[in-house]
Regions:
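Residues at alpha-helix termini
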Residues: 71-72, 123, 164, 187
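A short, hydrophobic secondary-structure junction motif
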Residues: 30-33, 120-128, 187-188
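Alpha-helical scaffold elements adjacent to nucleotide-binding pockets in ATP/GTP-utilizing enzyme cores
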Residues: 63-71, 115-119, 153-156
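Conserved RNase H-like, two-metal-ion catalytic cores of nucleic-acid enzymes
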Residues: 1-111
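Metal-dependent DNA phosphodiester-chemistry modules and their immediately adjacent helices/loops
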Residues: 82-137, 145-152
Length: 193
């Protein structure tokens, strides 16, 4: 199977405190099919993730993959390729602030930002306001719908990244660098006394 999935997960906190994944949503970029997994279906979602040859996500290296590893441990071991749209966005559109003045719908506080929220405005697919109106303590269907919207925005961003035909070597190098920086952030650095 040559399955390429855009993914997003919603958790009950940031990496340092989270202990639960509430839901996962994936989109197969070849078929357009959406896969949605709520708390009682997460094992089924993990099986599909492991089959994918490419996982695409916004901050997938910095958050989603480490969150899956933290919560599921050995149950989640992914060996395929990863494309982080946040890293690609920062690399390809380093001058984002200069470009953002053309987007009348984009709130000025999002100028220059590479967040999925900012990209939602730019791509005409707003995220919604679940984050402002809710906590992430307990799963709800609204949370899964919010996760689906993030996946749709990420998919559109992925298509935009692909259309740029940016240097694959530069993207690969950026991902390798981010991988090691994330390892340092998570594990810390030892100092001689």
């Amino acid at each position: 199977i040559n399955m390429k999935l855009v993914i997003d997960v919603e958790t009950n906190g940031f990496l340092d405190t989270l202990d639960k994944i509430h839901c996962m949503v994936f989109k197969d970029i070849e078929t357009g099919k959406i896969y949605s997994y709520n708390p009682d279906q997460l094992d089924e979602g993990l099986k599909l993730l492991k089959k994918a040859t490419l996982l695409i996500g916004h901050s997938i290296l910095g958050f989603d993959i480490p969150a899956l590893n933290k919560v599921f441990g050995k149950k989640f071991e992914y060996e395929g390729a990863i494309l982080d749209t946040l890293l690609c966005s920062r690399l390809i559109w380093a001058n984002r602030t200069d470009l953002d003045f053309q987007y009348k719908q984009l709130p000025p506080k999002l100028y220059g930002r590479h967040s999925i929220e900012a990209w939602g405005y730019r791509l005409g697919l707003r995220k919604g306001n679940f984050k402002e109106e809710n906590t992430f303590d307990v799963w709800s269907q609204d949370m899964t719908d919010y996760c689906k919207r993030d996946v749709e925005v990420c998919y559109l961003l992925y298509k935009l990244i692909e259309a740029e035909n940016y240097s694959k070597d530069a993207i690969k190098l950026e991902h390798q660098f981010a991988y090691w920086i994330n390892k340092l952030e998570q594990g810390g650095v030892d100092f001689d006394e």
